[in-house]
Amino acid sequence: MAHLKKNTRGAVPGLAVHFERKTDHHTNKEIDVSKTYLNQDLMADGSDMLSRFNARLNDVYCMKRDDVKALATWIVTLPEELTEAPYEQQSAFFEATTNFLNDRYGQENAVAAVVHYDETTPHLHYAFVPVVFDDKKSRDKVSAKEVLTRHDLQTFHE
């Protein structure tokens, strides 16, 4: 199962806290802190989600408005047939999913790929800045509307 959400700039710090488990006081009661050590950061490059997000926004044009959807997040849950599979096999599924999403939306636009094993169902949080090339202005720009079209969503599971 996969779920997409478009987020404004204002939502990014809160998402980063959740994705990277930067607090000990979780509002989500489903989080089992004894399993948090199992979580995986598939973008372990030494920086955090917020830094990667801000760095990518500095590289592309983004309108300075509060309502601009500057970040898109996919949540991909582990398929039922893999729930009893070994950790390594589950991990391989999430790595393959991350590679698929990087190919689809551009690895340079990815700002987070975190697997949570400490909640009820293991799942991947994949966050990226939706970027397209603006032919009129000859530059990259943020546009969730142009990246995440109905056609993109319809062909996602193919």
Question: Which residues does each predicted region cover?
Answer:
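N-terminal nicking endonuclease/strand-transfer module with a His-rich metal-binding environment
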Residues: M1-E158
